[in-house]
Amino acid sequence: MLSNTLRSNFLKFYANRHHAIVPSSPIFPHNDPSILFTNAGMNQFKDIFLNKETVSYSRATTSQKCIRAGGKHNDLDNVGHTSRHLTFFEMLGNFSFGDYFKKQAIAFAWEVSLSVFNFDPNLIYATVHEKDDEAFALWEQHLPSERIFRLTDKDNFWSMAETGPCGYCSELLFDRGANFGKATSPLEDTDGERFLEYWNLVFMEFNRTADGSLLSLPSKHVDTGAGLERLVSIISGTNTVFEADVLRLLISKTEELSGKKYHEDEALGAAFRVIADHTRSLSFAIADGLLPGNTERGYVLRKILRRSVNYGKRLGFTKPFLAEIVPSLVDSMGEAYPELRLSLSQIQEVMTTEEENYFKSLHRGGNLLQQVLKSSSTSSLISGEDAFKLKDTYGLPLDEIALLAKDYNFSVDLETFYQLEKEAKERSRKNIAKSQNATDAIYDSLSLGENSEFIGYNDLSCDTFIEAIVSEGKQVSSLQEKEKGALILKSTPFYAEKGGQIGDSGEIFCSDGTFVVSHTTSPKAGIVIHHGEVSQGQLSQAQAVTTQVNCIRRKRISNNHTGCHLLHKALEMTLGDHIRQAGSYVDDSKIRLDFTHPKAISPEDLASIELLVNEKIRENHQVETRNTLYSDVVNSKEIKQFFGDKYSDVVRVVSAGFSHELCGGTHAEFTGDLGYFRILKEHAVATGIRRIEAVTGKEAEILAHQDNEDLNEIALILQSPRDQILHKLQNILEEKKEQAKQISELETKLIHSLLDKLIDHCQQVNDVSFLIHHLPESESHRLQQYANCLHQKIPSRLISLWTTQKNGKYIIFSRISDDLIKQGLQAKDLLKILLAPCGGRWGGKDIFAQGSADSLPQTDALNNTLWQWISTQLN
């Protein structure tokens, strides 16, 4: 694969020039709610550019996996209809953090273009900002001035936000030749097809203030990005990014599955392109831990999947198919991104389940659309509200709604539809903004010295001082007795909630007062917030204090965290290598672990998992921790790490017997400290995600004791020895089953006896028999059974109506024999005639239907209505 070669050579080029090769960050940013998905290589370095984070390197290079399908950068609707729009792409990049600047960045880019990309230097063009004389002069060392163009802020100025770091940028373009347009320069090439941009170099040299002024940054940075798919297309000489390398491979697999050819019909070309691109987006997102859902990122993911299905229908797919394409993707990209291989079964399971659900929704939506069309008897217009509901709730695409409406000479109120869609998007945008603002901004504005020093791995108390106090969203100088607030300390033994572990509680005290810590959080890196209340006295900023963590609670939390690691490893050993943590939570009372697995775990496997964890507890292994460079363990198969998590340069490895994980949490000293481990329950929390809840130590002992007491109580009730309980229960169930069978047979005889009498009361319209009978509420659950039995006795020319009352409402059930259906009679039409005047509701099929209403006409009136309806229908 050319993409694998290019990626590898690009990274090697910069590594040989003292750049750290930094792994791609997750497809979604963990600590940046301002964007839905990672959409550029610089996202993971944002805090470095903002001077909020320091790293051990000043130069870096990456191949970043990106998705642009939501928010400001949203290419979703264009994918499939242009030559180069993608929702998923890889961004090659090199970065300098206060190290080299324009001169070296431009020299590197030129050398890479010639030696790595093997571009003809005579076909390379550059653009610079109109005011960037320095960049222009530097490019003149490599290019004639007539191939360097000055452009405005619109094209060649980059900013992270309205204020903050920003700077000029320079783009590199490749002339693909006259076959791609008649333009003779990038200025004439308005669609960018001939002179194709392949690399953008951003020079962060300014800080934009609120009044728009540009101030020079004390430390200048470089951020570059080159789209890998676009480079592959240029080098391969293809017209589009879809005709080369990985994307063409996925299109070929789709051709094989569909039996259609990509270039056979241009009208179908978009479908092949959409499926190839969307399969990549979905696979990488699921591998990083995202799942389709109804909000934010999950909603976008579901939208991508459903768009794939909609286009797949154009190729003849009527059942799930995406999972069959994924192995081709894994074969081509799994070496560079091992998370794809590890998550293959999970990706396929999620895709298939989502597709099945969507096909069901489409079927329901189609039926609902038919109802909408039939109910619009006075108009030939489907309301915008109905159309939007069909799309938003049931997933029926607008184009399918419009096509089906056209078959009935209906049209759709598009103006209202688009307005509702706009309002829904605005609500979604506001929800995202609300989520973004949820992090208390006060902590960003505090003037603090160095980050809070955490000493809690080894010490549970220390002497320190108060750096800041926050109360009711603002910084204050002191807290009085009974006042609630948050303290920030110079150093702390309190563990802040993160990594699935709950934060510590305890006390902070001084000569003037005591502050009871209820919980501890870390809203931003390096800051530990101690939340609580002054129980007596007062505390002031800069005051010397003594801290004391609740030792007993911390011990239980630490034991449970170690238990979570042991459980994770036991799951993998029992169920297979596909097991991946999808979330966890540990506190002082329980363990909760979410993990990837396609089905419920059998009781036998759960027992094996529990036994294995307890075996490791009895072996009493020392729990060891060590710090090491992430680069030394990133490819280790023995040490568990979680794709989707972002790790720093130095990581902490926790080893407990057979378990080895990257983890920053607190742990037991020995596995034997856990005492005992019990699983409480196992259940599904999402498609392909299971959850186990468990306990250790005293809680596990209490559970075992309760189980023992329950068994004693059951034995007493059954009047059976404990070792005979199971046998006794089996006998009882067999007896109950036999009794139920006898009751059912007796009920059937009684029903047939009643029906024999009712047959004599059937009325006639021409040669059609019809019956109306009211059942008592106690028999309301047997409406359909009565109807079916009667129609077995009289299989033709029969219509029956059965009514009853339930919870104050009238229930009515209709059944029509098959031969009358062939003459055009339908059970649901009959109920419509009967219930519409009463304001009732109904639904069903041709052969039977059911409805309800607050009131019904008297039996004579029902007889007359039924008689008239039959006469009209048959005549």
Curated annotation (Swiss-Prot):
GO terms for cellular component: cytosol. Keywords: Aminoacyl-tRNA synthetase, ATP-binding, Cytoplasm, Ligase, Metal-binding, Nucleotide-binding, Protein biosynthesis, RNA-binding, tRNA-binding, Zinc. Its main location: cytoplasm. It catalyses: tRNA(Ala) + L-alanine + ATP = L-alanyl-tRNA(Ala) + AMP + diphosphate. Zn(2+) binds at H561, H565, C663, H667. Its cofactor is Zn(2+). Its EC number is 6.1.1.7. Binds 1 zinc ion per subunit. InterPro entries: aa-tRNA-synth_II/BPL/LPL (IPR045864), Ala-tRNA-lgiase_IIc (IPR002318), Ala-tRNA-ligase_IIc_anticod-bd (IPR018162), Ala-tRNA-synth_IIc_core (IPR018165), Ala-tRNA-synth_IIc_N (IPR018164), Ala-tRNA_ligase (IPR050058), Ala_tRNA_ligase_euk/bac (IPR023033), DHHA1_dom (IPR003156). It is found in: Cytoplasm. GO terms for molecular function: alanine-tRNA ligase activity; aminoacyl-tRNA deacylase activity; ATP binding; tRNA binding; zinc ion binding. One of its GO terms (biological process) is alanyl-tRNA aminoacylation. The keyword RNA-binding applies. The keyword Nucleus does not apply. NCBIfam families: alaS. Catalyzes the attachment of alanine to tRNA(Ala) in a two-step reaction: alanine is first activated by ATP to form Ala-AMP and then transferred to the acceptor end of tRNA(Ala). Also edits incorrectly charged Ser-tRNA(Ala) and Gly-tRNA(Ala) via its editing domain. Belongs to the class-II aminoacyl-tRNA synthetase family. Consists of three domains; the N-terminal catalytic domain, the editing domain and the C-terminal C-Ala domain. The editing domain removes incorrectly charged amino acids, while the C-Ala domain, along with tRNA(Ala), serves as a bridge to cooperatively bring together the editing and aminoacylation centers thus stimulating deacylation of misacylated tRNAs. This is Alanine--tRNA ligase. It comes from Chlamydia felis (strain Fe/C-56) (Chlamydophila felis). The lineage of its organism: Bacteria, Pseudomonadati, Chlamydiota, Chlamydiia, Chlamydiales. The gene is alaS.
